[in-house]
Regions:
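Thiamine diphosphate
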Residues: 1-128, 133, 150, 169-170
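Short, contiguous, pocket-lining structural segments
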Residues: 6, 28, 144, 157, ...
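Conformationally flexible catalytic loops at phosphate/diphosphate-handling active centers
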Residues: 48, 52, 163-221
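Conserved thiamine diphosphate
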Residues: 119-169, 193-194
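Low-complexity, flexible helical/coil segments
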Residues: 58-64, 113-118, 137-145, 172-175, ...
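Short basic, glycine-rich beta-strand/loop surfaces that mediate nucleic-acid
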Residues: 98, 152, 179-181
């Protein structure tokens, strides 16, 4: 057993199962991005023995755009966000779902600011992305947050449907509790390597070029 908060539990799984992590901090998800950046800076490796590349973009829109590019080149990618940050990602979430990109976005759910800023928790952010085509999985404890993070990374590879894994901001993201940690060998044994290989084979490559993102008329769209 280890003592950890929800953000730390999720970040650990996401970091160890990813190759490219695009970030832009926003409360209360910031510590997931901060920990991933610190781990990469310290040379911590993922389950395949590589140090994930963590890149901070200019906004959440840039972060999800970087994720999209990484996925198109066959990398395993993830990101973290909350509130208005999630809303900035909506256009690209539609693209990721439509292009069947395996990807997990970890969301510490938080109130969307309207007449005033609020950093407190509700589901107004995640409820705004229900129509994007992404699957959604909600965790309600620190243990669930860790376990569902892994389940999301497995399920998105199996289904080629992007997953939004969310949990309550502060109430779960900052809750400190004892959990049973997931070891590297457990992660590696549960991740579907055949689906990872298929994802890499679909990568854009100048050796066998393809066209993606074309314009379509109503008869075929």
């Amino acid at each position: 057993m280890i003592t950890i908060d929800g953000n730390g539990a999720v970040a650990s799984v996401a970091f160890r199962t990813s190759e490219v992590i695009a970030i832009y901090p926003i409360t209360p998800s910031s510590t997931m991005a901060e920990q991933a950046d610190a781990w990469a800076g310290n040379g911590l490796k993922n389950v395949w023995g590589d140090v994930p590349r963590v890149v901070e973009m200019q906004s959440e829109a840039g972060a999800i755009g970087a994720v999209h590019g990484a996925l198109q080149t066959g990398a395993l990618s993830t990101s973290f966000t909350s509130s208005q940050g999630l809303l900035l990602m909506i256009p690209t979430l539609y693209k990721l779902a439509g292009q069947l990109m395996p990807f997990v976005l970890h969301v510490a759910a938080r109130t969307v600011a309207t007449h005033a800023l609020s950093i407190f928790g509700d589901h107004s952010d995640v409820m705004a992305v229900r129509q994007t085509g992404c699957a959604m999985l909600c965790a309600s404890s620190v243990q669930e947050a860790q376990d569902f993070a892994l389940i999301s990374h497995i399920a998105t590879l199996q289904s080629r449907v992007p997953f939004i894994h969310f949990f309550d901001g502060f109430r779960t993201s900052h809750e400190i509790n004892k959990i049973a940690p997931l070891a590297d060998d457990t992660l590696l044994s549960l991740l579907p390597q055949d689906k990872i290989d298929e994802h890499r084979q679909r990568a854009l490559n100048p050796e066998h070029p393809v066209i993606r993102g074309t314009s379509a008329n109503p008869d075929t769209y």
